[in-house]
Amino acid sequence: MLCSSFSVSRLAIPAVCILIAFLAYTSQIFFLYFEDAPLKEDEVWRINILAICIWICYYRACTVDPGHVPKGWMPSDRERLKADRASGRQRWCRRCEAYKPPRAHHCKTCERCVPKMDHHCPWTSNCVSHFTFPHFARFLFYAVVGIAYLETRLWQRVSKVWGSRHLPSYLGPSMGQIGHLFVLFVTNSLTLFALSLLLLRTLWSLGSNTTTIESWEIERHETLLRRARRLGGSLPGPGGISVHITKQEFPYDIGIWSNIRAGMGGSANVLSWFWPLARTPDRSTGLEFEENGFEDPTVSWPPPDPDRIPLPPMDQRDSFMYDITDTSGTSGQIDIEAFNRRKEADLRRRRAPTEIERRKPFHVRLEEYSNGSSDAEADTGSDDDSDHGEEGWKNSEGERLRDFGVDEEAEFYDEEDIPLALLIQQRAKRQHLSQ
């Protein structure tokens, strides 16, 4: 019986290694004994050189540290930080108890904020980030090139076997060889198809300087714009606030050449982009990124999202009270149902700060607003219903934030609860610099 701590994800790297070895080396054994069309010497060299490149790039994609936010790091742009706080953007990570740089996200698996996090890849058991993306992209490139080359060699043998299908069996390959060829060809073809799609997606991200998480954020922003147009340009936020939604351009698309250069470690040497032993991007980078200047300098990404704005402090929320309505026209009577609803909503708002107040999906809240429910009743849902909260919003491909390895609670419900000690420390540092 497997131990309770065992996870299937631990088998991912061994499975990939077995697949690489199976395609790269058992295929050569097959070619060695396939008398009708043995491999030429130059073909053997090509297969093995490509296999070495795949092994090196995969090893580095698995083992290179995806990076972390330096202890005590603070944003250098104070004006943007103030604007972020005003708009509710999550720049403070409650999990790490530290500021998050632009494009950084808290990975649930790595349990830290990762600079320019793209996604947590289950096949490398590592985050694809500012520091590991070049190795990951090279691995995909050499894997597709190597598998495509092997596909052409296998197809030649498949064609020969098919062309001699009417000859006596003793003149052709054995049943074991045919079975081996069939398994090699099917496995290689399926792997080539899957990795080709992933490589194309990665190249698109590289050319547009957009991570998979940011692609999700762009689609989320477009959804919020459509919702806002239906409701007069604004959307309701927590605590009954109204958030004006305007179109915001993605700031990190700085031109295809500059995008590729930035994604591949900042080097302008094209050959280094393909070199398996190329150095990892400098560890001093990954905290600030060049922008295209289409938006005001104080505006940061991602755009304001009413469902990701922190709940107002307790002293700024509505205090507990009951509704008194005059149903008879002569004397006030207590509406018991409204009283109980307000009481339950107030108790939910007064939970311990470690608990999460989840927001219901937009279509549910919209229906409840139209039915006359109060903001507090319509806003928050049960903790047990987490899979159906607004943090479960999916893009057109059916992906939600947790599919990229992101800690959804930290991204959607993290409060700007910056410790008082840190605020005092920041103030003292500013006073020291001004002297």
UniProtKB/Swiss-Prot annotation:
Residues 359-408 are annotated as: Disordered. Residues 32-48, 151-179 are lumenal. Residues 376-388 have a biased composition (Acidic residues). It holds the Pfam family DHHC. The chain crosses the membrane at residues 11-31, 49-69, 130-150, 180-200. It is a multi-pass membrane protein. Residues 359-368, 389-405 have a biased composition (Basic and acidic residues). It comes from the Eukaryota. Keywords: Acyltransferase, Endoplasmic reticulum, Lipoprotein, Membrane, Palmitate, Transferase, Transmembrane, Transmembrane helix. Residues 91-141 form the DHHC domain. InterPro entries: Palmitoyltrfase_DHHC, PFA4, PFA4/ZDH16/20/ERF2-like. Belongs to the DHHC palmitoyltransferase family. PFA4 subfamily. Mediates the reversible addition of palmitate to target proteins, thereby regulating their membrane association and biological function. HAMAP family: DHHC_PAT_PFA4. This is Palmitoyltransferase pfa4. It comes from Emericella nidulans (strain FGSC A4 / ATCC 38163 / CBS 112.46 / NRRL 194 / M139) (Aspergillus nidulans). The lineage of its organism: Eukaryota, Fungi, Dikarya, Ascomycota, Pezizomycotina.
